[in-house]
Design a protein with these regions (language model features):
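Conserved helicase/translocase motor-coupling segment
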Residues: 307-361
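Structural signal for conserved beta-strand scaffold positions within catalytic alpha/beta enzyme cores
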Residues: 8, 159-161, 238, 260, ...
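Conserved interdomain linker/interface between the two RecA-like ATPase lobes of SF2 helicase motors
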Residues: 227-324
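Glycine-rich phosphate-binding "P-loop"
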Residues: 78-79, 103-110, 210, 273-287, ...
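Residue-level detector of flexible, active-site-proximal loop/helix-junction positions
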Residues: 13, 164, 243, 265, ...
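Accessory, non-ATPase domains that flank or precede helicase/AAA+ motor cores in DNA-metabolism machines
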Residues: 1-240, 247-248, 252-268, 302
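A polyampholytic, Gly/Pro-enriched intrinsically disordered region
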Residues: 177-184, 279-285, 357-359
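Residue-level "hotspot" positions that anchor or transmit function at local structural transition points
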Residues: 82, 213-217, 285, 322, ...
Length: 361
């Protein structure tokens, strides 16, 4: 047996061909016209068949089976945190386009309280009876975000990504399409969930390159999220401390609404920073660190304090690719590329620490 989807009505054809018999109609399996329009646009823009996009949207065909659904959350009365003056202004800027399509960029330095601002917007959308989708660039961020969400709202959101179990995915899918699940936090694939009454999309860390999918159906989740918001005629909020060049350019051209948090929450000071240009500093033989940096490190170590180094790259190669078939090794836990470390001859995940021995390279 196969599950089919009625896509459109056409005039009867005079051609003779066999048509499979319809065994039954699935009552709790219905996609609205808005999502159909988005799938058509997604397919044409990314040069991929509608069938492949539908497969991403529908997932396991057993989604149609009657299963336990999420209970609809009650209205949220208030948050536990109070917004400061700058945050209130940014919130008002985001509210300007509440019931229509508009891309808004919320920019702010790290620790400025951007999350608090869009959490307040989410509260308003949820209380209006509509659904909200929050997109995050990496799978491992969803669990961290889940705890933060629980702290603010008092209930756990649904999490959607490739590592979520089939049973839970079916539960989320059915609850989303029936409108009983109001909020989903997920990675790229959550963008194609069949929401019944979507009211807002939030794309956190919009600058992150992980939003671009390079395998299978190739697309950029940020651009597709904007397209879906346009089709749904709802606002979308892009959140970032360091916006992408594309987003920044659209702000400059007045295409996007823009608001910014210029200071950290509770006026917490930024750390002191200094730039040492190695092209202007003479280094000693076999040294790759300037004397000024070494002296500073020694001063902290003498006080029994710690020093943390951030390196721009670890490992011999950021990923391995097969010349014949194009296969790339992904971490089974995090779904990111494994980095090849030549000294230990292993592929290593820099997120979870997973190591895979590679005999022949």
């Amino acid at each position: 047996e196969e599950i089919g989807l009625v896509w459109d009505k056409i005039q009867p054809s005079k051609k003779k061909f066999k048509i499979k018999k319809i065994l039954k109609k699935i009552d709790n399996f219905k996609i609205n016209k808005t999502l159909i329009n988005f799938i058509n646009w997604f397919s044409a823009y990314n040069l991929v068949s509608r069938g492949m996009v539908l497969k991403m949207c529908l997932g396991d065909r057993k989604n149609a089976i009657k299963i336990e659904e999420y209970k609809k959350e009650k209205k949220i009365t208030r948050l536990k945190f109070i917004l400061n003056k700058d945050q209130k202004k940014s919130l008002e800027d985001l509210r300007k386009f509440s019931n229509t399509f508009k891309v808004s960029l919320l920019q702010g330095v790290t620790g400025s309280g951007k999350t608090l601002v869009y959490f307040e917007r989410i509260k308003e959308i949820l209380n209006s009876g509509k659904q909200v989708l929050i997109l995050l660039p990496e799978i491992f961020l969803t669990n961290q975000f889940k705890e933060r969400f629980l702290q603010f709202f008092g209930f756990l959101p649904a999490i959607w990504h490739s590592k979520v179990g089939v049973k839970n995915k079916r539960k989320i899918w059915q609850s989303v399409i029936n409108g009983n699940l109001n909020l989903v936090i997920g990675a790229r694939s959550a963008l194609l969930l069949p929401f019944k009454n979507l009211g807002l999309i939030v794309l956190d860390e919009e600058h992150d390159p992980s939003y671009k999918q390079d395998e299978g159906i190739i697309y950029h989740a940020r651009d597709m999220a904007i397209a879906r918001a346009s089709v749904e005629n709802i606002p979308i909020h892009l959140i970032s401390a360091v916006p992408s060049l594309e987003t920044y350019n659209n702000v400059k051209k007045k295409k996007y609404n823009y608001t910014r948090l210029v200071s950290r929450y509770s006026d917490f000071p930024l750390p002191e920073t200094a730039v040492i240009d190695l092209e202007k500093v003479s280094l000693k033989n076999n040294h790759f660190i300037a004397d000024e940096t070494l002296n500073l490190i020694e001063s902290f170590l003498e006080k029994k304090e710690q020093v943390l180094f951030f390196l721009n790259r670890r490992g011999y190669a950021p990923f391995l690719i097969c010349k014949k078939c194009g296969f790339k090794h992904l971490c089974p836990n995090c779904s990111i590329y494994l980095t090849y470390h030549k000294q230990i001859n292993k592929l290593v995940c820099h997120h979870c620490g997973k190591k895979i021995k590679k005999e022949k390279i």
